[in-house]
UniProtKB/Swiss-Prot annotation:
Domain of life: Bacteria
UniProt source species: Shewanella sp. (strain ANA-3)
MF term (GO), any: nucleotide binding
Domain HRDC: 230-310
GO biological process: tRNA 3'-end processing
Function: Exonuclease involved in the 3' processing of various precursor tRNAs. Initiates hydrolysis at the 3'-terminus of an RNA molecule and releases 5'-mononucleotides.
Cystine pairs: none
Name of protein: Ribonuclease D
Record family assignment: Belongs to the RNase D family.
Cofactor(s) annotated in UniProt: a divalent metal cation
PANTHER family found in the cross-reference section: RIBONUCLEASE D
UniProt-listed Pfam families: DNA_pol_A_exo1, HRDC, RNAseD_HRDC_C
Length: 388
């Protein structure tokens, strides 16, 4: 049976009697199904998750918080391994999903639910687009808008341990309770500035591609310092990075707990041919050598040296990079000031690199982010005039 706990917090001071709130600890299927049936009729649903991630590739989901303005639920995924009924809420187009700084939550939804929330309203992005500052934390946003001070003391606790403490439950409930109260303020500000569409566009961008499986053949491109290697060495790195990713997924281990990046780079450079060669490497731990040594030697023998990858392209090393980067950054900085948009939203290093790569590739491929959607409306004309 589900436990009921009473949280004496008012959603709207003018409607005290109507909105005295109950939060429900959901740990059985019947309660979950009843809750989902209610939420399916709600126009707005606040979502948050609590999880643990230490050595694992995937986060370990410890709790799901949800609130529709009527019932605040703390859903126990440890007691409820089958949450398919709940996941069906995520892509219901009639329910706005309200979250805060949700990139890690989206990872959880993708892994456990195989779905992404849509339409998505991220309050951190909303605050940025409203001119309240970039990257505002939840506690700071609540204090700024509602005058409430939130205790964040439970944020690093063990969410997999049972039973959860009253302090953990209260902390988790507050994460969605106050977010529900923030929504009207943020939505009104965005509407007044005609930027609500921008916010939902950002939600679509954040969820795009989240359900795709990791690309094994390009895993080597995500290894730190891969750009240092020759084509011959990259052939070894490619098979090693693919093997490491496969191993990490199979054992649910963070990549660094299989072999760290610098270990892969060392193997690709030194190319051990025997266990004796491998044991001499100082860049691998004794545990890595003992557990993975034979596998490493076997995998390295599969490297396709006749058809190696191309050298990793490093934009910052190209002639003219510094001046081009500076010109683009100056242009975008002026536009950000003109439109009261944080530089991180329009002119981040990633945005500039993506645009510059596109320009130098003679405008091949899909449009860079800074030329797409609302960003393109603001920046496309000015950027086209630059000589880069």
């Amino acid at each position: 049976m589900s436990r009921l706990l009473f949280l004496w917090t008012v959603l709207n001071p003018q409607e005290l009697e109507k909105n005295l709130s109950v939060f429900q600890y959901v740990s059985d299927e019947a309660s979950l199904n009843a809750l989902v049936a209610q939420y399916q009729q709600s126009p707005l649903l606040v979502l948050d998750t609590e999880f643990v991630r230490t050595r694992t590739y995937y986060a370990k989901l410890g709790l799901i918080q949800a609130y529709d303005g009527k019932t605040l639920a703390l859903i126990d995924p440890v007691a409820l391994p089958d949450l398919s009924a709940f996941w069906s809420l995520l892509d219901n187009p009639n329910i706005i999903k309200l979250v805060h700084s949700c990139s890690e939550d989206l990872e959880v939804f993708a892994h456990y639910g195989q779905r992404q929330p849509t339409p998505l309203f991220d309050s951190q992005i909303a605050a940025s687009l409203c001119g309240m500052g970039h990257g505002l934390g939840y506690a700071k946003l609540v204090e700024t808008c509602l005058g409430e001070v939130i205790d964040k003391g439970e944020s690093r606790t063990d969410w997999m341990r049972r039973p959860l403490t009253e302090a953990q439950l209260s902390y988790a409930a507050n994460d969605v309770l106050y977010l529900y109260q923030l929504y009207p303020q943020l939505a009104d500000k965005l509407k007044a500035q005609d930027r609500l569409g921008w916010l939902y566009e950002e939600g679509e961008r954040m969820t795009e591609g989240r359900l795709a499986t990791p690309d094994m053949d390009t895993a080597y491109l995500r290894v730190k310092n891969a750009f240092q290697l020759t084509e011959h060495q990259l052939a070894y790195l490619k098979v090693l990075a693919k093997w490491r990713l496969e191993k990490a997924l199979a054992r649910d281990l963070a990549l660094g707990f299989v072999i760290k990046d610098h270990g892969l780079i060392a193997l690709a450079k030194k190319q051990p041919k025997s266990m004796g060669d491998l044991l001499k490497l100082n860049d691998l731990t004794e545990q890595e050598k003992r557990i993975h040594g034979k596998d490493i030697l076997r995998v390295m023998q599969t490297a396709d040296l006749s058809n190696p990858p191309e050298l990793v392209d490093v934009l910052a090393l190209k002639p003219g990079y510094k001046s081009a980067f500076k010109n683009i950054k100056t242009c975008l900085s002026e536009l950000c000031e003109q439109h009261a948009i944080p530089m991180e939203m329009l002119g981040s290093k990633r945005h500039i690199h993506e645009y510059l790569q596109w320009r130098w590739d003679k405008q091949q491929g899909e449009l860079p982010t800074v030329l797409s959607g609302w960003r393109g409306q603001i920046a496309a004309e000015s950027l086209a005039k630059l000589d880069v």
